[in-house]
């Protein structure tokens, strides 16, 4: 799928706003500027007539890093409109609680706990906080029938508490009577088990108590339903918890691990490659006030959707112009003893990258960042150009060079009325490194920009 861009909308007014934003960022980072570089000023920006080639690669749930967990969504601040969230990964946000020995001797858990269930792992292992059951269901050694039944009853009570707190009833579990919130002593107890683990436990529980496993339990994969749908009496949609294994196979859900971050050299060596989180209370249920707010309003149909698009961008241009003015300072025998005016003009570049646009409908905002293209998506000619820019045939480790391998400049050192040095190679190379480094530090994931969108009744993609 491709996008049609109206390149004429990039007018002088938008260019001026971009320049103001860039110059404010430069003023804020003036202390990081080298001592031999004077004040930097971006004076002119022209996007040119060469528009990029943009294509949609995937549309998925929002990455957890983009979700605004520090403030409630608009519907909780008074706007009566909701957007259902995915349950593929659960983000529990709750006050810090202390747990005793009956929770495995765990002291305190973080305010926010990310829990991911991995169906590819053995069914008796769960990746998450220690307060989630991670021991073998069958035990580490042989058990008598009575001991096996006792272990099954213990796990039955634990999972019954967790499922009942979410209003979920599973086959073979008995009644799903809601328990008081005081009985749900751990925030992570509201997290449903993964399908593989729950099915294994259910079969073992049936085997320990009755000596056989019902056929319906073996074939059942729908172990978790949305609490709101069960509350309404309908069967409800299948929870995305049972589809984690399918979603995890999609490369579009994972931040790229190539380049600097794959080697553990970036600011975030280990990134969470999960789907969007869902916000739930300790008990896993909405309060009565939130239930009333969750009623769909007439304007909810026109609300901005919550989704994430991955775009592929290829932008070769020779008409782009960006004028930069600064000065070279000579700090001997004293500071700023001599100053040489320096004017740089970017006259063209070659850019290829992935663009992540995450629309957060509940907060009316958009998150934008750049990512490196995957190895199988990159053009061999583009890779060779990046290798030439790096000066070696080795695998590139710099995201800035991968995204922006070619930059052309016109430079002038001095003043027109006096002596002028043109096209100074070392100065141009230094400025190119500064631009690539700035691009990597500002826009390349895990760095991103958040844009507050104006409230409107209708939005179109």
From Swiss-Prot:
It is a peripheral membrane protein. It is found in: Mitochondrion outer membrane; Endoplasmic reticulum membrane. GO terms for cellular component: endoplasmic reticulum membrane; ERMES complex. Residues 1-454 form the SMP-LTD domain. Disulfide bonds: none annotated. CDD domains: SMP_Mdm12. Its main location: mitochondrion. Keywords: Endoplasmic reticulum, Lipid transport, Lipid-binding, Membrane, Mitochondrion, Mitochondrion outer membrane, Transport. The keyword Membrane applies. One of its GO terms (biological process) is phospholipid transport. The keyword Membrane applies. Residues 80-97, 272-288 have a biased composition (Polar residues). Component of the ERMES/MDM complex, which serves as a molecular tether to connect the endoplasmic reticulum (ER) and mitochondria. Components of this complex are involved in the control of mitochondrial shape and protein biogenesis, and function in nonvesicular lipid trafficking between the ER and mitochondria. MDM12 is required for the interaction of the ER-resident membrane protein MMM1 and the outer mitochondrial membrane-resident beta-barrel protein MDM10. Component of the ER-mitochondria encounter structure (ERMES) or MDM complex, composed of MMM1, MDM10, MDM12 and MDM34. A MMM1 homodimer associates with one molecule of MDM12 on each side in a pairwise head-to-tail manner, and the SMP-LTD domains of MMM1 and MDM12 generate a continuous hydrophobic tunnel for phospholipid trafficking. This is Mitochondrial distribution and morphology protein 12. It comes from Mycosarcoma maydis. The lineage of its organism: Eukaryota, Fungi, Dikarya, Basidiomycota, Ustilaginomycotina.
């Amino acid at each position: 799928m491709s996008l049609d861009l109206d390149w004429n909308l990039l007018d002088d007014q938008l260019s001026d706003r971009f320049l103001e934003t860039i110059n404010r960022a430069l003023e804020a980072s003036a202390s990081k500027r080298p001592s031999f570089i004077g004040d930097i000023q971006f004076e002119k920006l022209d996007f040119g007539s060469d528009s990029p080639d943009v294509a949609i690669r995937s549309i998925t749930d929002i990455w957890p890093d983009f979700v605004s967990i520090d403030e409630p969504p608009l519907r909780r601040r008074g706007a009566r409109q909701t957007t259902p969230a995915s349950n593929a990964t659960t983000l529990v946000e709750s006050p810090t609680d202390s747990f005793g020995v009956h929770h495995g001797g765990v002291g305190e858990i973080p305010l926010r706990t990310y829990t991911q269930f991995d169906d590819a792992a053995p069914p008796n292992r769960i990746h998450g906080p220690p307060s989630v059951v991670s021991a073998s269901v069958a035990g580490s050694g042989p058990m008598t029938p009575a001991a096996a039944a006792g272990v099954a009853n213990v796990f039955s009570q634990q999972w019954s508490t967790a499922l009942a707190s979410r209003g979920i009833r599973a086959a073979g579990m008995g009644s799903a009577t809601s328990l008081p919130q005081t009985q749900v002593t751990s925030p992570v107890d509201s997290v449903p088990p993964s399908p593989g683990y729950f099915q294994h436990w259910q079969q073992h529980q049936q085997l320990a108590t009755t000596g056989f496993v019902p056929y319906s339990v073996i074939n059942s994969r729908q172990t978790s339903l949305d609490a709101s749908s069960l509350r309404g009496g309908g069967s409800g949609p299948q929870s995305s918890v049972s589809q984690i294994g399918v979603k995890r196979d999609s490369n579009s859900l994972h931040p790229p691990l190539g380049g600097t971050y794959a080697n553990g050299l970036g600011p975030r060596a280990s990134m969470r490659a999960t789907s969007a989180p869902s916000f739930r209370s300790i008990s896993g249920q909405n309060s009565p006030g939130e239930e009333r707010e969750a009623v769909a309003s007439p304007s909810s149909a026109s609300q901005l959707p919550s989704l994430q698009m991955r775009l592929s961008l290829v932008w070769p241009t020779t008409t782009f112009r960006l004028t930069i003015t600064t000065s070279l300072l000579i700090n001997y025998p004293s500071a700023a003893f001599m100053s040489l005016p320096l004017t740089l003009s970017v006259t063209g570049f070659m850019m290829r990258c992935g663009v992540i646009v995450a629309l957060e409908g509940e907060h009316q905002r958009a998150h934008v960042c750049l990512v490196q293209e995957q190895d199988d998506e990159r053009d061999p000619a583009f890779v060779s150009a990046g290798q030439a820019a790096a000066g070696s045939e080795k695998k590139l480790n710099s995201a800035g060079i991968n995204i922006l391998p070619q930059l052309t400049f016109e430079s002038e050192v001095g003043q027109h009325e006096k002596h002028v040095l043109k096209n100074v190679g070392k100065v141009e190379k230094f400025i190119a490194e500064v631009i690539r480094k700035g691009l990597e530090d500002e826009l390349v994931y895990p760095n991103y920009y958040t844009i507050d969108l104006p409230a409107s009744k209708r939005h179109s993609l």
